[in-house]
């Protein structure tokens, strides 16, 4: 029946055909037929009513509202059309318009439904006192017999939502749980319960409720293709159907992704997004689009920025979008763009940025032009947060003394949240001096924060880095690098390659060569095991360790050994040559060439020959490897032919020939 026009339908069959299409959820085709029919009979009540229904089911709420508005004008005595119009406007997030239409309804039989709608509008607008007042009216029975009572499932859900928005997550959980017990399994209520658990940092029960939603969704609706995309199966979009909405699968997978991301299980987070029922990109909801942008930012930053910028133009957009876009601009050092977005969207600043986040972003933007002023701003923010941390530490101690477990849990959660705000402020302060290569001052900043941060992995890692960079504190650096590596020793490739490399160098510089060799054997063994499962996978850990060690020897003037180590580290080239590894290798070669041109070193012909052969291999294997990763929002892109390892290796080879006077 695809593409069927009204002229092809036999006389007397039109209504039956339309109802069959609606029965089969083929709303788009029904819309085509009804729209054509209404051009001939624009005042057909039945046609407009069915068209409005189809638009509503297709989630084209503004179009549905327009149809219901026409119907209410044609039939003012039928107030249900005005109610439907208000509901469609609410669904379209046109809250002032929905409120205006709802106020026109004075039929007592619609009173409780209007109250529910008005409460939902106020809740969506963020007017929680107004929403609570209307919900309490409903619960008290003032709205008539069908308004429910205190133990009515709808009432419990409404109260749960209000408690959630007010930050009372434990109480919200109780309401949602009671609603499920009263009504039986409801996907949307189960999702609400999972969300409240997540917000209360109870990740295990949240994941349990999510797993239940997913399991039931798969069992009851196998046609939704859950997990197909992750498995690499090419499937068509399932669309934004009512069935998909009713299963709460999209919401569940998004929440699962958020939890895994919070737990730093980034692969699992990405998998949760690809596991959800397949839809075309233009069909994605704002939350999924936002999460895709965030979780693929490292691999596809340009795409991520485009998605977040697009979302900011939509109404509504996830409330985190504004802050996340600004933070990412600062992370990628697009401070001018961050300043422009803040200036152009002052109305969003007060709505979506906390005072802490605004002050932090303001300091970060100031860093670009006035680092001293930025440091003072960050210091003020750090002082405020350290006061809060001390107060919360005292609260925890007092609560433990009084054996008040509930207060302990609440204070510990608040402490953790405050610490997560403090760490970025501290790191931003440290980065100002790091950029000036004033490592002693960076160390001093970190030492001031030891009271709160000594157990925090990010703090420990950065302390290790600053000790390492001072070149006379390798032993102290080992004390910070070692616990990080040992914590992940059974999965050593999950540790950053530069951490492993710096630890190896620190061992070598403190004459602990056996420890360095043992660590390198461990890395090599894990890389070999990984290669058995996926022979074509590029793994750079051991390569980068060897490159950093080679760089160390080059820096000490031992180019014979250093360059040889660098060259051997990149074998086999098809598995070890990449943008990052080339970066380390070319630095050593540039240093070598600089010293050769100054005649401060002399290399044996055999070493020079080895260098030339190495660069020729890089020329062969580096054709499709970018020499540098370009910034995602650069307007002027590098020439694609020049931004390759092949091009740069030819340049280096030409420089070698020029310096040593060989004929090419």
From Swiss-Prot:
<keyword id="KW-0969">Cilium</keyword>
<keyword id="KW-0802">TPR repeat</keyword>
<feature type="coiled-coil region">
    <location>
        <begin position="507"/>
        <end position="534"/>
    </location>
</feature>
<feature type="repeat" description="TPR 4">
    <location>
        <begin position="188"/>
        <end position="220"/>
    </location>
</feature>
<feature type="repeat" description="TPR 1">
    <location>
        <begin position="11"/>
        <end position="44"/>
    </location>
</feature>
<feature type="repeat" description="TPR 2">
    <location>
        <begin position="45"/>
        <end position="78"/>
    </location>
</feature>
<dbReference type="GO" id="GO:0042073">
    <property type="term" value="P:intraciliary transport"/>
</dbReference>
<keyword id="KW-0966">Cell projection</keyword>
<keyword id="KW-0970">Cilium biogenesis/degradation</keyword>
<comment type="subunit">
    <text>Interacts wit the IFT B complex component IFT52.</text>
</comment>
<dbReference type="GO" id="GO:0120170">
    <property type="term" value="F:intraciliary transport particle B binding"/>
</dbReference>
<dbReference type="InterPro" id="IPR039941">
    <property type="entry name" value="TT30"/>
</dbReference>
<keyword id="KW-0677">Repeat</keyword>
<feature type="repeat" description="TPR 7">
    <location>
        <begin position="458"/>
        <end position="491"/>
    </location>
</feature>
<dbReference type="GO" id="GO:0030992">
    <property type="term" value="C:intraciliary transport particle B"/>
</dbReference>
<dbReference type="GO" id="GO:0005879">
    <property type="term" value="C:axonemal microtubule"/>
</dbReference>
<feature type="repeat" description="TPR 6">
    <location>
        <begin position="424"/>
        <end position="456"/>
    </location>
</feature>
<feature type="repeat" description="TPR 8">
    <location>
        <begin position="543"/>
        <end position="576"/>
    </location>
</feature>
<feature type="repeat" description="TPR 3">
    <location>
        <begin position="153"/>
        <end position="186"/>
    </location>
</feature>
<dbReference type="InterPro" id="IPR011990">
    <property type="entry name" value="TPR-like_helical_dom_sf"/>
</dbReference>
<protein>
    <recommendedName>
        <fullName>Intraflagellar transport protein 70A2</fullName>
    </recommendedName>
</protein>
<comment type="function">
    <text>Required for polyglutamylation of axonemal tubulin. Plays a role in anterograde intraflagellar transport (IFT), the process by which cilia precursors are transported from the base of the cilium to the site of their incorporation at the tip.</text>
</comment>
<dbReference type="Pfam" id="PF13432">
    <property type="entry name" value="TPR_16"/>
</dbReference>
<keyword id="KW-0175">Coiled coil</keyword>
<comment type="similarity">
    <text>Belongs to the TTC30/dfy-1/fleer family.</text>
</comment>
<feature type="repeat" description="TPR 5">
    <location>
        <begin position="395"/>
        <end position="423"/>
    </location>
</feature>
<dbReference type="InterPro" id="IPR019734">
    <property type="entry name" value="TPR_rpt"/>
</dbReference>
């Amino acid at each position: 029946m695809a593409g069927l026009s009204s002229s092809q339908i036999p006389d007397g069959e039109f209504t039956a055909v339309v109802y069959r299409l609606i029965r089969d959820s083929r709303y788009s085709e029904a819309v085509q037929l009804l729209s054509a029919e209404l051009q001939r009979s624009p005042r057909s009540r039945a046609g407009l009513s069915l068209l409005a229904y189809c638009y509503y089911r297709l989630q084209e709420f503004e179009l549905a509202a327009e149809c219901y508005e026409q119907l209410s004008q044609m039939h003012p005595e039928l107030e249900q059309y005005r109610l439907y119009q208000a509901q469609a406007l609410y669904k379209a997030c046109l809250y002032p318009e929905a409120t205006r239409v709802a106020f026109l309804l004075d039929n007592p039989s619609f009173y409780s439904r209007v109250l529910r709608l008005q409460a939902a509008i106020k809740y969506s607008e963020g007017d929680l006192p107004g929403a609570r007042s209307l919900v309490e009216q409903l619960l008290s029975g003032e709205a008539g017999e069908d308004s429910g009572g205190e133990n009515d499932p709808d009432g419990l859900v409404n109260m749960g939502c209000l408690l959630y928005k007010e930050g009372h997550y434990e109480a919200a959980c109780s309401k949602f749980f009671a609603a499920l017990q009263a009504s039986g399994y409801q996907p949307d209520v189960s999702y609400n319960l999972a969300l409240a658990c997540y917000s209360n940092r109870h990740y295990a029960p949240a994941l349990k409720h999510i797993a239940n939603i997913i399991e039931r969704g798969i069992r009851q609706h196998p046609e939704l293709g859950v997990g197909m995309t992750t498995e690499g199966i090419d499937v068509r979009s399932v669309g934004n159907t009512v069935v998909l909405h009713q299963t709460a699968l999209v919401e569940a997978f998004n929440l699962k992704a958020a939890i895994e991301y919070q737990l730093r299980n980034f692969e699992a987070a990405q998998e949760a997004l690809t596991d959800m029922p397949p839809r075309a990109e233009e069909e994605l909801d704002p939350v999924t689009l936002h999460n895709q942008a965030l979780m693929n930012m490292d691999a596809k930053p340009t795409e991520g920025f485009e998605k977040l910028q697009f979302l900011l133009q939509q109404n509504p957009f996830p409330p985190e979008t504004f802050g996340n876009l600004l933070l990412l601009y600062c992370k990628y050092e697009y401070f001018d763009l961050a300043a422009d977005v803040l200036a152009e969207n002052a109305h969003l600043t007060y709505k979506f940025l906390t005072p802490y986040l605004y002050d932090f972003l303001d300091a970060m933007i100031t860093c670009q032009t006035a680092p001293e002023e930025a440091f003072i701003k960050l210091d003020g923010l750090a002082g405020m947060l350290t006061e809060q941390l001390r107060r919360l530490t005292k609260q925890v101690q007092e609560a433990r003394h009084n054996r008040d477990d509930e207060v302990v849990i609440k204070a510990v959660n608040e402490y953790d949240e405050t610490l997560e705000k403090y760490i970025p402020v501290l790191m931003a302060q440290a980065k100002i001096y790091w950029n000036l290569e004033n490592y002693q001052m960076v160390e001093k900043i970190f030492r001031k924060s030891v009271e709160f941060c000594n157990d925090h992995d990010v703090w420990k890692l950065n302390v290790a880095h600053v000790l390492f960079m001072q070149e006379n504190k390798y032993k102290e650096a080992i004390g910070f690098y070692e616990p990080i590596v040992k914590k992940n020793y059974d999965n050593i490739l999950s540790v950053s390659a530069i951490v492993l490399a710096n630890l190896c160098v620190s061992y070598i510089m403190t004459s602990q060569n056996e420890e360095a060799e043992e660590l390198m054997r461990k890395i090599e063994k894990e890389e070999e095991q990984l290669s058995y499962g996926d022979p074509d996978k590029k793994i750079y850990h051991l390569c980068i360790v060897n490159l950093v060690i080679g760089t160390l020897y080059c820096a000490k003037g031992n180019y014979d050994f250093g360059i040889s180590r660098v060259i051997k580290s990149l074998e086999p080239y098809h598995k070890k040559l990449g943008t990052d590894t080339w970066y380390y290798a070319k630095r050593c070669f540039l240093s070598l060439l600089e010293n050769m041109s100054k005649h401060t070193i002399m290399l044996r012909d055999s070493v020079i020959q080895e260098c030339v052969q190495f660069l020729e291999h890089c020329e062969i294997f580096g054709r499709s490897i970018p020499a540098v990763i370009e910034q995602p929002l650069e307007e002027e892109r590098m020439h694609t032919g020049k931004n390759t390892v092949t091009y740069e290796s030819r340049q280096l080879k030409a420089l070698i020939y020029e310096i040593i006077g060989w004929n090419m």
